[in-house]
Swiss-Prot record:
Coiled coil: none annotated. It comes from Cupriavidus pinatubonensis (strain JMP 134 / LMG 1197). Homodimer. This is 2-aminoethylphosphonate--pyruvate transaminase 1. Its cofactor is pyridoxal 5'-phosphate. Keywords: Aminotransferase, Pyridoxal phosphate, Pyruvate, Transferase. GO terms for biological process: organic phosphonate catabolic process. Pfam families: Aminotran_5. The keyword Transcription regulation does not apply. It catalyses: (2-aminoethyl)phosphonate + pyruvate = phosphonoacetaldehyde + L-alanine. Involved in phosphonate degradation. Disulfide bonds: none annotated. InterPro entries: Aminotrans_V_dom, NH2EtPonate_pyrv_transaminase, PyrdxlP-dep_Trfase, PyrdxlP-dep_Trfase_major, PyrdxlP-dep_Trfase_small, SP_NH2Trfase/AEP_transaminase. One of its GO terms (molecular function) is 2-aminoethylphosphonate-pyruvate transaminase activity.
Length: 378
């Protein structure tokens, strides 16, 4: 799917983008220009449609990385006297805990092993144990290891117990089904440089209208105030502060390609084929995935590092990179791993090519793989 000599990014974002998406950034836009503001408006409408949130939810775009929008969502949706339950099974859950701490929001951590998903039963028990909890902040796809947390069941528990739900869908939005009609949430956060296959620089929050209307004054920040951002956009069609114009234009092109491809079902199926091709090919080389297939999201796969003493991730990374592929280091605490992403403007043929590149690298490093061998400790 990719032409030219650019490296293929096998990461959970930034990721490899199409030529058309890159070309969309060749034009300059005025941030107050009506044509540019129409692009922003059309993006927001389409993003709400992807989760079937028409009439109940609105889209608030926000400058910056996805984490900016996660912080904005927590700061606006959770009142200053609120309390957040954070099911924690990875690095991005830990980031939410840090955000809550910095914001001064009371919070409770629900520890979960990094190779297991959160469960609705555990969340329900935690909510019943502490009735003062007002919200749950749930990472949908925890890309620290690649775990897919069961959002439909968690959303049902929150709705039944009257708790607000904030979803970090950074690495799942556009690839895994999310339906606001059957998975109620107060806010859902994603970003341009993930499964819609745009470039980094803008996040967005899909927030329930009634929740946003009641959030005035909650935010600790001027720049991250979703209520102010939305009301200003409604009045003027403009962003409050300078938007990432090239990022927005590229995202419009990426979203057009997403819709032309067939939307979430087809995009998700392509990523699943990428995942299956990768795992099957790596198994032939002797690599074992860290996660069980029943909890693995088809977004990024964590593999155990070779047990061979000659293995060094930096050397391995550079040699694979010299063959045109950029991998991701592991983010786990107990075992040494590395990660390979399955998302971006790539297909299963590209996954076969990366498996070949990894196999060549192993031979060059003199590494012998034993599929059932030891796992090298971190």
């Amino acid at each position: 799917m990719i032409r030219g000599n650019d490296p293929i990014l096998l990461t959970p974002g930034p990721l490899t983008t199409s030529l058309a998406t890159k070309q969309a950034m060749l034009r300059d836009w005025g941030s107050w220009d009506a044509a540019f503001n129409a692009i922003t408006g059309s993006l927001c409408e389409d993003l709400v449609r992807i989760v079937h949130g028409e009439g109940t939810h609105v889209c608030v775009p926000m400058q910056g990385s996805g984490t900016f929008s996660v912080e904005a969502a927590i700061a606006n949706v959770v009142p200053r006297d609120g309390k957040v339950l954070v099911p924690q099974n990875g690095a991005y859950c830990q980031r939410i805990l840090k955000i809550c701490k910095v914001l001064g929001r009371a919070h409770v951590e629900l520890p979960i092993p990094e190779d297991r998903p959160a469960t609705a039963a555990a969340i329900e028990a935690a909510l019943k144990k502490d009735p003062s909890i007002t919200h749950v902040a749930q990472v949908h796809c925890e890309t620290g290891a690649g775990v897919l947390n069961p959002l439909p069941e968690i959303a049902a528990v929150c709705a039944r117990l009257g708790k607000g739900l904030i979803v970090d869908a950074m690495s799942s939005f556009g690839a895994i089904e999310i339906d606001a009609r059957t998975m109620p949430f107060d806010a859902l956060v994603a970003a341009t440089g993930k499964c819609i296959e745009g470039v980094p620089g803008m996040g967005f929050v899909l927030v329930k209208k009634t929740v946003l209307e009641g959030s005035q004054g909650n935010s600790h920040s001027l720049a991250l105030d979703l209520y102010d951002q939305y009301t200003y956009m409604q009045k003027t069609t403009q962003w409050r502060f300078t938007p990432p114009t090239h990022v927005v234009a590229a995202f419009r092109t990426a979203l057009d390609q997403f819709l032309e491809e067939g939307g979430q079902p087809v995009r998700g199926e392509r990523y699943r084929r990428n995942y299956e091709t990768l795992v099957q090919g790596m198994a032939v080389l002797g690599f074992r995935p860290f996660l069980s297939p029943d909890v693995q999201a088809p977004i990024i796969v964590t593999f155990h590092a070779p047990a061979d003493a000659r293995y060094d991730f930096r050397t391995f990374y550079e040699k694979v990179r010299s063959r045109g592929y950029i991998l991701y280091p592991g983010k786990l605490t107990q075992v040494e791993t590395f990660r390979v992403g399955c998302i971006g403007a790539i297909d299963d043929n590209e996954m076969r090519n990366v498996v070949s590149a990894i196999g060549e690298t192993l031979r060059e490093m003199g590494i012998s793989m034993q599929p059932e061998g030891r796992v090298r400790a971190a």
